[in-house]
Amino acid sequence: MDALLALHRRSRRTVVGLMSGTSLDGVDAALVQLDGSGPDLTMNPEAFVHIPYPTALRDLIRTNTDPASSSVQDVTRLDARLAETYAAAVDRVAAEADVDRGTVDLVGAHGQTVCHLPEPADCAGKDVRATLQLGNPSTLATRLGVPVVGNFRAADLALGGQGAPLVPYFDRVAFTAPDEARGLLNLGGIANLTVLPAGAAPDDVRAFDTGPANMVIDALAARLFDAPHDPDGRHANAGTPDHDLLADLLEGEYFRREPPKSTGRNDFGPDYVDRLLGAAQSRTLSPEDTMATATLLTAASVYQAYAQYVRPEQAIDELIVSGGGVHNDTLLRMLEEAFTPIPVRPTSDYGVAPDAKEALCFAVLAHEAVNGTPTNLPSVTGASARTPLGSLSVPGP
């Protein structure tokens, strides 16, 4: 208990943030020095690593994100197995930063989402909202001998929120500008957009998931080209989008739903990819044309969401992009064309590595959980109140 009190009272902490997203490509780990809280928080990133999932682990996770193929036994074992992977990632990023793991004060571990059900639904006579992220925080804390904050989404769901997106707290702290409105777009498996008016207060922030980013593109790359992703967007660049199919796709139920909203594999997973492929084949599209259409779907759905749900209230002066999608040159070109004349820039222009942003976010959320600082934003998630996010797991003596 004395150690926990000392951790709470300490303003400056060495924190590792861990993020494994819906793209299922592996775990990102960022080691960062954090000091202060809220708008006074200062951040000094020291190292970042990406640890790819072994093929067998990735395939097992993917199998267990599908209700038709998941099993309780597999999910239970994955909860422990992923904690071991996360422990290795902490060791790797500490080595990359050339620091002893014993100097790490805290770990923030998002976990691997296998199911996210933010809309209330009946469960044995009671409506509930629910989410499940694997990578047991107590197992991780025990392996590392370091306190771990995990289970970040449950408190917001308990307050009637979507439990997502959570990155907007980080966006506000790191990117709010006094004299311009900014859009922060993260292109992971899912695309999420944060809108920061000039000098944004917490209640001014708006954010939501716009739809798929890399999730559909990567699935099509696997199906059409036997590749984990479309490198640099080269297959999409070699094709021509089918605008009639694109128009049909943009009429999908999720795109028509008003914020606050969040999404994942339930909406844009294997079943969605099957339907898209079927529609492409009925139009006799080539693999390259199919990839071009799916890539444009990401860019067009982001812009459509901005035009419908953001611009009428708050136009942005620039769009700042992060996540794995920044490496897809075709996707970035399509975004630039859609948002012209608004400039599209990577977060690296502002001192935050695009691949590291989400891992840094969960380091910050863990740091603020120990501070007792509320980090959900009801204007974003729809929750009824603000609350600290995350549960603290502590190692044994």
UniProtKB/Swiss-Prot annotation:
Pathway(s) per entry: Amino-sugar metabolism; 1,6-anhydro-N-acetylmuramate degradation; Cell wall biogenesis; peptidoglycan recycling
Molecular function as annotated in GO: ATP binding; kinase activity; phosphotransferase activity, alcohol group as acceptor
Described purpose of this protein according to its UniProt entry: Catalyzes the specific phosphorylation of 1,6-anhydro-N-acetylmuramic acid (anhMurNAc) with the simultaneous cleavage of the 1,6-anhydro ring, generating MurNAc-6-P. Is required for the utilization of anhMurNAc either imported from the medium or derived from its own cell wall murein, and thus plays a role in cell wall recycling.
UniProt protein name: Anhydro-N-acetylmuramic acid kinase
Record Pfam families: AnmK (PF03702)
Swiss-Prot/TrEMBL catalytic activity: 1,6-anhydro-N-acetyl-beta-muramate + ATP + H2O = N-acetyl-D-muramate 6-phosphate + ADP + H(+)
Domain of life: Bacteria
Stored InterPro entries: Anhydro_N_Ac-Mur_kinase (IPR005338), ATPase_NBD (IPR043129)
